[in-house]
Each structure stands twice: as C-alpha cells, then as structure tokens.
Amino acid sequence: MKLLPSVVLKLFLAAVLSALVTGESLERLRRGLAAATSNPDPPTGTTNQLLPTGADRAQEVQDLEGTDLDLFKVAFSSKPQALATPGKEKNGKKKRKGKGLGKKRDPCLKKYKDYCIHGECRYLKELRIPSCHCLPGYHGQRCHGLTLPVENPLYTYDHTTVLAVVAVVLSSVCLLVIVGLLMFRYHRRGGYDLESEEKVKLGMASSH
C-alpha cells in the first residue's frame, strides 16, 4: 500500500511528458498550416514539404508510442524512495546527539583508571590533567605516601601526669594500710604484755 502513491505519481508524470511531446508535434503541424495559409499560391514543392506525408505521420506516431513506452518502463523500473517522516528525523537527530555525547567521557574511567593508588581520580578539564583525592592517612600526587600518626605532646603530658597521680595515690593507700596494721599489732601486743605481767604477779603472790 505504501508503494501505490509513488506509482500513481510516476504514471501521472509519464502522462504529462507524453502530452507535452504530442503537443510539440501538433504545434509543428499548426505552424506549417499557418505558413501555407499566409502564402495562398505556394509552389507545389513547398506545400508538399510543409504537409507531412502518410509515411511521416506513421513514423511520428511510432516515435510517440515508443517514447510513452520508455517513460512507463522508467516509471516501473525505478525504486520508490520512502518519504522521511518527522519521527524518523527526530530519531536520527537523537542518535547523532547520543554519539556526540559518548565522545565526551571522563578520562578517569578509562585512561587514568589506575592513576590514583589510594584515592579517587578527578580530571581537571581546565588544566587537562588528572588529580587525586587521597584517602585519610595517604598523601602525594598519586596518593602513594603513607602519613604516620604523630603523638600530641600535650596529650602525652596529660597521660603521664595521670599515671603519676594514680601511682602516688596507690602508694599513699598502701602506706596507710601498713601503718594501720602495725598500729593494730602493737596495740594488741601491748595488751598481751599487760596480761602476762599480771599473771606473773599473781603467781608470785600465791607462792608466798
């Protein structure tokens, strides 16, 4: 069904061309008749030359038929060209745009994929060079250097001070415990000595 409009159009063009060719031949005959009427007593040879003979007319008819056949053959042999629809044109433009966007890819995804050792690659379009965003603890152009942790002197001083205070407190507690035990033992021993002296005195008194 899609080929029908193009075939009809070509047939119409062929008919127009054949009409034009026929019109040209009729125009020639009219010119000859006009020349004959303008010269009423022309020589016999001139009139015979202007008026076509039967053989000439038959030849012209054959030529016209051959021309029409050639036009019809050309019309049927040529392949119809599909008309471009707006939808197809839009799809073509979208495909072209997609191809153009595909060329502008991030070089860090392919060319500089392994450029940063311990970090993330970021391409600087203005400078046209890759840059690395290093992970914590790494430094350098390609994040290849390891940053060693440095102790804070203030933090070290505070830690030492706390340990010293704790040691002093524990030592003081130990000394207090030792002193308390000694005092308790001495007090107990003093009471035991008094009891023994009283027993000795009582024994001596009973012996007398």
UniProtKB/Swiss-Prot annotation:
Record bears the keyword Secreted: yes
Listed transmembrane segments: 161-184
Segments in the Extracellular topological domain: 24-160
Glycan-carrying positions: 85
Annotated propeptide span(s): 24-62, 149-208
Full protein name: Proheparin-binding EGF-like growth factor
Compositional bias annotation for Basic residues: 91-102
Keywords for the protein's UniProt record, in alphabetical order: Cell membrane, Disulfide bond, EGF-like domain, Glycoprotein, Growth factor, Heparin-binding, Membrane, Secreted, Signal, Transmembrane, Transmembrane helix
Any one Gene Ontology molecular-function term assigned to this protein's record: transmembrane receptor protein tyrosine kinase activator activity
The record's account of how the chain is modified after translation: O-glycosylated.
Assembly information from the UniProt record: Interacts with FBLN1. Interacts with EGFR and ERBB4.
The keyword Secreted is annotated on this UniProt entry: yes
Biological role stated in the UniProt entry: Growth factor that mediates its effects via EGFR, ERBB2 and ERBB4. Required for normal cardiac valve formation and normal heart function. Promotes smooth muscle cell proliferation. May be involved in macrophage-mediated cellular proliferation. It is mitogenic for fibroblasts, but not endothelial cells. It is able to bind EGF receptor/EGFR with higher affinity than EGF itself and is a far more potent mitogen for smooth muscle cells than EGF. Also acts as a diphtheria toxin receptor.
Family matches, as InterPro entries: EGF-like_dom
Encoding gene, per UniProt annotation: Hbegf
Signal sequence interval, chain numbering: 1-23
Organism: Rattus norvegicus (Rat)
Gene Ontology biological process terms, A to Z: cell chemotaxis; cell migration; epidermal growth factor receptor signaling pathway; ERBB2-EGFR signaling pathway; ERBB2-ERBB4 signaling pathway; negative regulation of glycoprotein biosynthetic process; nervous system development; positive regulation of cell growth
Ranges for domain EGF-like: 104-144
